[in-house]
C-alpha cells in the first residue's frame, strides 16, 4: 500500500513539474540601460527570440502609453524595436515594451534610456611642479561632469605628442578614485625635461581621450627633513556604501620612505588575499588599494589597513563598509513552461535585496487577481490550473537601489 502511494506521488510530481514545450513568442533579453549620444541614431530593441510575425508591439515611457509615431522615431519591420533617429535629452526615460500575440501579452523589463555626455574643458594647461625629493606629492585632476561618470587615465607623455606616451606603473604612484595622482615619494627618476604627466578623461560620449591637465617635474628641491621616514596619510577612504554585485575599492595611501605595503583586515581577519581572490590587495597598487571584484552582502563590516615601513610610527585606518542591494533573483522561472490542467502549479520566483524589495505579479501585463492564485516568498501558486490560465506571468521586485523582472509563458496542456 505504501509502495503504491509513493508511485502515485511520484507520478503527480512529474506531471506538476514544468516541462519544455514548442517555442512560442518570448521576448529576447534586453540591457537594463541603453546610452545614446545626442543626434546619433540609437536603437531600443524589442523583438521575440524567434522573430515571430503575428505579434503586435506597443511601448510605455515612464509608466504611460508612448506613441512613438509622434516622435522622430522609426520602428524596425516585424519587430517592436524603436530607432531614435536623432535622440535628444527629452527622449530620456524609463521604457517598457509589450508584445501581444495569441499566447497573451509579454512584457519587457524596464529599460533606462539615458543621454551620455561629458562637459569638456575649453582649455588645457601644463603646470610645472618642483617637489621636495623624497616627499609625497599629489597631482590634481578634477573629473569632468558627465554621464556615466568619466574615467580618468594618466600617462607619461613626450611633450605635446600624444602618440608617444607610456602608462604609469611605478609602485610609488597610485591614482585615487577622485582622479588625482599620488606619489608616496618623489625620486630623481620622476624628473624629466621632455616628458610630462598628463591626466585625460574617457567617456562613451566622446571618441578617444580628452586631455584635462598636464604636469612637468623638471627638478627637485633638496630634502632637509630629518624625519622623512614618517608615514603621512595622503588619501584614505572614508566610510562607504557599496552595492552588491559592483566592484568596490578601498584606499589606504600613505607617503614616506621607504614605502609601506599595507596589510588588510576585515573585522580582524586577514583579507590580503591572492591575486586571483575575489578580495585582494594585489592589484598593481602595492597594497594601497583593497580590491573587491564582486561585492557581496556578507562583505559588510569594518575594513582596517595596518601600515608600517619599519622606520616611522606604524599607522592604522578603518573604514566601515555598508552593503546595499537592488533586487537580485536567487531563483526565477524558465522563459516558457507547460503545466498539466487541473494540477496545482508553482511558478518559482525568489528575490534577494537590501532593503527588502516587495514582489508583485502580473498576468498578461496586468496586475494578477483571483482566488486561485497565491503569492509567497518562493513564488506564485495557481490552484487547479486551467486552459484559461495560459499566458505570461511576470515577477517584479523594486527597491531604492534597482528593480528586477522575470517572466514566464505558461502553456496549459
UniProtKB/Swiss-Prot annotation:
One Gene Ontology term from the biological process aspect of the record: defense response to Gram-negative bacterium
InterPro entries registered for this protein in UniProt: Cell_Adh-Cytoskel_Orgn, Ig-like_dom, Ig-like_dom_sf, Ig-like_fold, Ig_I-set, Ig_sub, Ig_sub2
Annotated compartments: Secreted
Main location: secreted
Signal sequence segment: 1-18
SUPFAM superfamilies: Immunoglobulin (SSF48726)
Gene inactivation effect: Silencing by small interfering RNA (siRNA) leads to reduced protective effect conferred by non-pathogenic E.coli infection prior the subsequent infection by lethal and highly virulent pathogen Photorhabdus luminescens TT01. Speeds the rate at which insects die after the pathogen infection.
Signal recorded as keyword: yes
Keywords linked to the UniProt accession: Disulfide bond, Glycoprotein, Immunity, Immunoglobulin domain, Innate immunity, Repeat, Secreted, Signal
Function: Insect-immune protein with antimicrobial activity. Forms a protein complex at the bacterial surface. Can inhibit hemocyte aggregation.
Stated name of the protein: Hemolin
Amino acid at each position: 500500500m505504501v509502495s503504491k502511494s509513493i508511485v502515485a506521488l511520484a507520478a503527480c510530481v512529474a506531471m506538476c513539474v514544468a516541462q519544455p514545450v514548442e517555442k512560442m513568442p518570448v521576448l529576447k533579453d534586453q540591457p537594463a540601460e541603453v546610452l545614446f549620444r545626442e543626434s546619433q541614431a540609437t536603437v531600443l530593441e524589442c523583438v521575440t527570440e524567434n522573430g515571430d510575425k503575428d505579434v503586435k508591439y506597443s511601448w510605455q515611457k515612464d509608466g504611460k502609453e508612448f506613441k512613438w509615431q509622434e516622435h522622430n522615431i522609426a520602428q524596425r519591420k516585424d519587430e517592436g524595436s524603436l530607432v531614435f533617429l536623432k535622440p535628444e535629452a527629452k527622449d530620456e526615460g524609463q521604457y517598457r515594451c509589450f508584445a501581444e500575440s495569441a499566447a497573451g501579452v509579454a512584457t519587457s523589463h524596464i529599460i533606462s534610456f539615458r543621454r551620455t555626455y561629458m562637459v569638456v574643458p575649453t582649455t588645457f594647461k601644463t603646470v610645472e611642479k618642483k617637489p621636495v625629493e623624497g616627499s609625497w606629492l599629489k597631482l590634481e585632476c578634477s573629473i569632468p561632469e558627465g554621464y556615466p561618470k568619466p574615467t580618468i587615465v594618466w600617462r607619461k607623455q613626450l611633450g605635446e605628442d600624444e602618440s608617444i606616451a607610456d602608462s604609469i606603473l611605478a609602485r610609488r604612484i597610485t591614482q585615487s578614485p577622485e582622479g588625482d595622482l599620488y606619489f608616496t615619494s618623489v625620486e630623481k627618476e620622476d624628473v624629466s625635461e621632455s616628458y610630462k604627466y598628463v591626466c585625460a578623461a574617457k567617456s562613451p560620449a566622446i571618441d578617444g581621450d580628452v586631455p584635462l591637465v598636464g604636469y612637468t617635474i623638471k627638478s627637485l628641491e633638496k630634502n632637509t627633513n630629518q624625519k622623512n621616514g614618517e608615514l603621512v596619510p595622503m588619501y584614505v577612504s572614508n566610510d562607504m556604501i557599496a552595492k552588491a554585485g559592483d566592484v568596490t575599492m578601498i584606499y589606504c595611501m600613505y607617503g614616506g620612505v621607504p614605502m609601506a605595503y599595507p596589510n588588510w583586515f576585515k573585522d580582524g581577519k586577514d583579507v590580503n588575499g591572492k591575486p586571483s581572490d575575489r578580495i585582494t590587495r594585489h592589484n598593481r597598487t602595492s597594497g594601497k588599494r583593497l580590491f573587491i571584484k564582486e561585492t557581496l552582502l556578507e562583505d559588510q563590516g569594518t575594513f582596517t589597513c595596518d601600515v608600517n615601513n619599519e622606520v616611522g610610527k606604524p599607522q592604522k585606518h578603518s573604514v566601515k563598509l555598508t552593503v546595499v542591494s537592488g533586487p537580485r533573483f536567487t531563483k526565477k522561472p524558465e522563459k516558457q513552461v507547460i503545466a498539466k490542467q487541473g494540477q496545482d502549479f508553482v511558478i518559482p520566483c525568489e528575490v534577494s535585496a537590501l532593503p527588502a524589495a516587495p514582489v508583485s505579479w502580473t498576468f498578461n501585463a496586468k496586475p494578477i487577481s483571483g482566488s486561485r492564485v497565491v503569492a509567497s516568498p518562493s513564488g506564485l501558486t495557481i490552484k487547479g490550473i486551467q486552459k484559461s490560465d495560459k499566458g505570461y506571468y511576470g515577477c517584479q521586485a523594486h527597491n531604492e537601489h534597482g528593480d528586477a523582472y522575470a517572466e514566464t509563458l505558461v502553456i496549459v496542456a
